[in-house]
Amino acid sequence: MRVLGLFERGNNLNFADTYVYTWNQQYSYHENAFLISNQVATTIILYLDGININEVNKAFELLNSNGIPALIIKPDHIGIFTSSNFTYDWQYKIVYFHEYTYYKNNEFIVSDEFWLYTNINELLPYKILYYERGMRELYAGREYTLYNTATDDDILYKYIYEKDSIMNGTDYKKLYDTNSVKNFVHFMRLLRMRFAVPFDQLSNRITRSRVFSKSRIHIGLRNESIPQALDNIHSQWINYSANGIVISELKGLGSYSEKKISEFGIGQFKNYMNFLTLMFYIKNMKKKPSCTIIGAAPGYWISSMKKYFTIVTYDNKEVDSTEHHNRYFTDDDIVNVKTNGVYIDVRSEFKTNDWRQRRKLIEEETIKWLEISYKLLENKRVEAILLKMTAMDGEIPDGYCVHSPTTYRKSEYYLLIDKHIIKRQKIKVTKSLMYNAINTIYSDNVFISGKYSLRGKTEGVLALYCLSNTINQKEKVIQYANSFSGTCMTVRLNNTYEVDKIIDFKTNSDHTFLPSDFTCSLNTILTSYRGYAGIFGYAITKDLKSNGNNHIYIIPNARDENNFDTFGSHLGLSRYSHSKRFSESATTMSGYIFRDMVSGKENMQDTDKDNYASGHVFNAIAHYRFDYTYDIVGWLRLHKTGQFKVKSDIYKEHTDSEIRNAIESAYVYYLLDGDKVGEKYSKKMMEIWEVQV
């Protein structure tokens, strides 16, 4: 949802799913904010004439801090604000739309400039446009700044990594006769326009920036964090991604199997991924990364990296780098290398048609550059090297096997080594071992590191989307969360009907958790993505759905001790239950009647007056488990310890019997729904309350 304030009245009811809210002058800004937040319409319009604007601003501030975007807009912007989802940076008054109507103009938006230098424009019937970070400014004024951030980057990534499985799918085959990139992009755009805009992905690009800059230890970084990692490259941080395969871990046998991976050239993509892999590997050594690139041309991606790294290049063709040597690298240059990283991407043009002779020359050249790498690592400045290798028999260092996709899969892969790796025992490899790796492994993450241990201090830790992984024991994750004092961590929310559900993905699986599993510090907030966004200065328009991809965000030191409702509060609590009541129930009072029936009350004449507020507790437990924005666990614990504070003119303290009745009602609700997870959840809530009692 979104709340839009307008000083000028207009024909705004023509927009679908829009509600005009009438400000109640008899209520405080706090109560008006609550009433606004529980409207079931997507867009809430508030006309501001005749209203105390200071009260409106306070209500909007409360909505925004709870992750519900509320702002006063210009009348001529009503169209885009009501028709598009967006992420609102309410601290700096910046609106980031996630808006794909540029498809009408036959445009294809990318955020990496090197795509402009491929033949992709010849294969697609669209105009390929590049914008740094995908950001297009739509409006800049005193009120706010508007950007559109939607891109087609994810379609390119899916083509590179997932096109075979997608094109072999039944739906694709029913629609298209050929497996072309043109048809693939058309298919992915069809899916997008079929109400499948990747909102979380687009919004996370924005909201991740603030939490990244506040953190020193990052757990589970993946490629979507590349922009934030680059922006913070000169600050102190390291990452743990449990990612990367070393040579000694390779298994299986294979043979040479050339395959065209992409219709358009992705050699620049491969080099960009390889370069970042090396740079972030050195970053994890607590060094300021820099790089010498040997065999750099054409290097269309290098110019955009100069702002983050010192890049020295060697090639007989021109390259836009920090320092370019317009010649080939020689042994004499080894002592002059001043960067701590070296990327070697050399393959000579051998003038022979004899494939055996060519293989012999390639292997000899590979050995030569491997020997040069050893010498480079004797240079006190050089910390790590990523070099091109080929499948061959022999002994090589037990470094990381890096194999980012390129246009044609042949015999090449890359080896990441450092000073420590080359001192360890070398690994004997065979052609067939390496061909199997080349044919089956594709590197999809530029962050390579060891596994994070759930021990020790947690200050400065940011762990988004990873600690739920089954490589960690569930009980140890709960213990870790209970003492967590970092920036933010997440676990996957169990909004299924299966107790202790484990969710499987392509390469791993996740435990699922309930908010009632945790006993964190009272100043720690447990909430949803929307609540997390509000805490860090953002608000989102998308209504949260129970789709198996929901997380519990655990955020220490976030509680406003003087006003519980500032963050992760009951704002928006009734939207879900309102929708169910109006579509499935005979009365809006059904929840309260249900509660009183469970309690055994025979005279329910005053159901709409007595204990009205405790309906919130029932609502929070019975309906909000599937999203968990309202931190009802924190509410229960604070309430009974006498530490609960809220700036509200209508709040009344609940009695012990009211709370018990609300929790029992939620239990019966789940029982009748056949929801075993809900039964467990409500029982645990009663345990939490009784401990506090």
Swiss-Prot record:
Family stated for the protein in its record: Belongs to the rotavirus VP3 family.
Protein keywords: GTP-binding, Host-virus interaction, Methyltransferase, mRNA capping, mRNA processing, Multifunctional enzyme, Nucleotide-binding, Nucleotidyltransferase, RNA-binding, S-adenosyl-L-methionine, Transferase, Viral immunoevasion, Virion
The enzyme's E.C. designation: 2.7.7.50, 2.1.1.56
Species annotation: Rotavirus C (isolate RVC/Human/United Kingdom/Bristol/1989) (RV-C)
Gene Ontology process terms (BP): viral process
Subcellular localization: Virion
Chief localization: virion
Protein name: Protein VP3
Protein origin, superkingdom: Viruses
Annotated region described as N7-methyltransferase activity, given as residue ranges: 187-255, 433-559
Known partners and oligomeric status: Interacts with VP1. Interacts with VP2.
PROSITE patterns registered for this protein in UniProt: SAM_MT56_VP3
Upper lineage: Viruses, Riboviria, Orthornavirae, Duplornaviricota, Resentoviricetes
Protein purpose: Multifunctional enzyme involved in mRNA capping. Catalyzes the formation of the 5' cap structure on the viral plus-strand transcripts. Specifically binds to GTP and displays guanylyltransferase and methyltransferase activities. Has affinity for ssRNA but not for dsRNA. Capping activity is non-specific and caps RNAs that initiate with either a G or an A residue. Together with VP1 polymerase, forms a VP1-VP3 complex positioned near the channels situated at each of the five-fold vertices of the core.
